UniProtKB/Swiss-Prot annotation:
Gene3D superfamilies: 1.10.287.130, HAMP domain in histidine kinase (1.10.8.500), Histidine kinase-like ATPase, C-terminal domain (3.30.565.10), PAS domain (3.30.450.20)
Topology of the protein relative to the lipid bilayer: Multi-pass membrane protein
GO BP of this protein: osmosensory signaling via phosphorelay pathway; regulation of DNA-templated transcription
Organism: Staphylococcus haemolyticus (strain JCSC1435)
Superkingdom field: Bacteria
Protein name as it appears in the record: Sensor protein kinase WalK
Length: 608
């Protein structure tokens, strides 16, 4: 196992990395050198063969031009002269009919005047272009690499034959192998020297690191007296010097570590809430950003001050009571912002029982309290809205039971009031059910792409025909605007807004409709303005709250439930839109609705 540990040491790893870098470098150089050398040698070989073939081509062309009757004999003599090169195995002249007219190889003389079926020869004759390829052939001494070259011979524009040359390229590769062997031997010698040098070089790096490792082991045992030997002024020497300084400082700081560790652990545990940490006297020493935000104070106003005074608890609790009482309680810690927090206190105690500080954890429950308050208000509003018509109905029914039904004048009036109150309760219950579905996201929204101009004009026309005493003014763009909405749900929204506009208008009633499109953001804004009594500026933002009425008596008299605009807001937001209001008291109210939209040309809208 000792050799395995030595193999895993930094010293060995540095040597291995050093050797691997050398090997990789030599491999890259060798690969490039071998490929370049092979390419150069083969190109030179082929260039020489092509030069011989070109000389043959010129001579054969001259023979066929000067003495065609005696051409075969003269070509044979010519090939015999060119066949004395060592690398050339065979030279043939093949006429345009693929008949062997002459050959330089004696063993192939029996093939003269015979037709040869060779694809490369046929290709050279048919295309009139030279070609070449490599093959392996056995000439009796084993398989050898042969380079075959075909060069067409032309007399003017007519191809009269083809020169076929087989050349032995094996010598080129033998020469290349010899060079590679020399390169490999040189690489091996270099690696041997590199390994030896690598061990000595790596030792100069690992020796100080080994010393620091040994010192670290001693420090883990609590021994801070030893120092690391500094071997030089390089980076490792500076590291050794810094390590010695660190050892000294750790020794000095060890006494304070336990107390700080416990305090920081407590702070980290509760970082999602507001954290206030103090010393043993209750003076604030650490406070996080959340606590600063919740208290609405700066860090300078908190650090060093008494924690109970900061939380306005100085008259109610003492540090001893906090230490004994672990109960949490609600505290209004920021009256300006209306922030309510649940406060938990904990005490930091050492193992000896000595108290070193206190921790206050502030958990923001403002939203929870708001939800609970809204729930109570909602229940109270529903109870009130149901109790009023029920009380009225009960009174009329009691009167009818006592004999009013016999009165032909009063009975119909009492029954009419009872029916109206019943219908109002039905509307209220239906609105509550719709809001409940929207809160639970179970309300079905069935969107479809509609022509908004046609959609809004249809709604306005319906109200215009029903309300003869109201003037409707339209400013709607002429270009077609398409939007994806649920027509029924959005009709409910516009009916709600238009009905309110007509209901609260006065004098010469006037309702204006403005539609403006922002093509850059694919949004459109619909503005519906009345000339009614308006809404006080401090109540404008509340009109979309459930059961909120600016004038409760007038709204109830007109049959409203106080839920119409709340439902409208939920529907618009379900369409990725927004609804809000602007109003000047005594000058009317404007309701704004924004929705996604597209301006689509007729050609883009045609279905395939």
């Amino acid at each position: 196992m000792k050799w395995l540990k030595q193999l895993q040491s930094l010293h060995t790893k540095l040597v291995i990395v050093y050797v691997l870098l050398i090997i990789i470098g030599m491999q890259i150089i060798g690969l490039y050198f071998t490929n370049s050398l092979e390419k150069e040698l083969t190109n030179n070989f082929m260039k020489n063969i092509k030069q011989y073939a070109t000389q043959l081509e010129v001579n054969i062309e001259r023979i066929y031009r000067d003495d065609p009757s005696n051409a075969q004999k003269e070509v044979q003599s010519l090939l015999n002269e060119y066949a004395n090169r060592q690398e050339i195995e065979e030279i043939r002249f093949i006429d345009k009919d693929q008949i062997i007219m002459a050959t330089a190889k004696i063993s192939s003389h029996n093939m003269i005047n015979q037709k040869v079926n060779d694809n490369s020869v046929q290709k050279a004759l048919s295309l009139g272009e030279s070609n070449s390829h490599n093959v392996l052939k056995d000439y009796g001494s084993g398989k050898e690499r042969i380079w075959i070259y075909n060069l067409p011979v032309k007399n003017g524009n007519e191809t009269i034959g083809n020169i076929y040359i087989e050349s032995n390229i094996n010598d080129v590769y033998n020469q290349l192998n010899n060079i590679n062997q020399i390169f490999i031997i040189g690489t091996a010698i270099s690696l041997f020297i590199t390994v030896i040098l690598g061990f000595f070089i790596a030792r100069t790096i690992t020796r100080p690191i080994t010393d620091m490792r040994n010192q670290t082991v001693e420090m883990s045992k609590g021994n801070y007296t030893q120092r690391v030997k500094i071997y030089g002024n390089d980076e490792i020497g500076e590291l050794a010097l810094a390590f010695n300084n660190l050892s000294k400082r750790v020794q000095e700081a060890q006494a304070n570590t336990e107390s700080e560790k416990r305090r920081l652990d407590s702070v980290i545990t509760h970082m999602s809430d507001g954290i206030i940490a103090t010393d043993r006297r209750g003076r604030v020493r650490i406070v996080n950003d959340m606590a600063i935000k919740m208290l609405g104070m700066s860090k300078e106003d908190l650090i060093g001050y008494y924690m109970l005074s900061v939380l306005n608890l100085e008259d109610e609790f003492s540090l001893d009571e906090i230490q004994e009482n672990n109960d949490s309680f609600l505290l209004d810690i920021n009256e300006d912002e209306g922030i309510i927090a649940r406060v938990n206190f904990s005490t930091i105690v050492q193992e000896t029982g000595f108290v070193t500080g206190y921790i206050a954890v502030l958990h923001d429950v403002t939203e929870q309290q708001q939800v609970e308050r809204e729930r109570r208000e909602f229940v109270a509003n529903v109870s009130h809205e149901l109790r009023t018509p029920l009380t009225s109905m009960n009174s009329y029914i009691e009167a009818l039971e006592e004999g009013v039904w016999k009165d032909d004048n009063l009975a119909p009036s009492f029954l009419s009031v009872t029916r109206e109150e019943t219908e109002r309760m039905i509307r209220l219950v239906n609105d509550l059910l719709q809001l409940s579905k929207m809160d639970n996201e179970s309300e079905q929204i069935t969107k479809e792409i509609v022509d908004f101009n046609m959609f809004i004009n249809k709604i306005i026309n319906r109200h215009e025909m029903a309300a003869k005493d109201t003037t409707f003014v339209r400013e709607i763009p002429s270009e077609t605007i398409f939007t994806e909405i649920d027509p029924d749900k959005m009709t409910q929204v516009f009916d709600n807004v238009i009905t309110n506009a007509m209901k609260y208008s006065r004098g010469e009633k006037r309702v204006e409709f403005h539609v403006k499109q922002n093509a850059l953001y694919n949004r459109m804004t619909i503005r519906i303005k009345d000339n009614g009594i308006g809404i006080p500026i401090n109540k404008v933002d509340k009109i979309f709250d459930r059961f909120y009425r600016v004038d409760k008596a007038r709204t109830r008299k007109m049959g409203g439930t106080g839920l119409g605009l709340a439902i409208s807001k939920e529907i618009v937001e379900a369409h990725n839109g927004r609804i809000w209001a602007n109003s000047v008291e005594g000058q009317g109210t404007s309701i704004f609705i924004t929705l996604p939209c597209e301006v689509i040309d007729d050609g883009d809208w045609d279905e395939e």
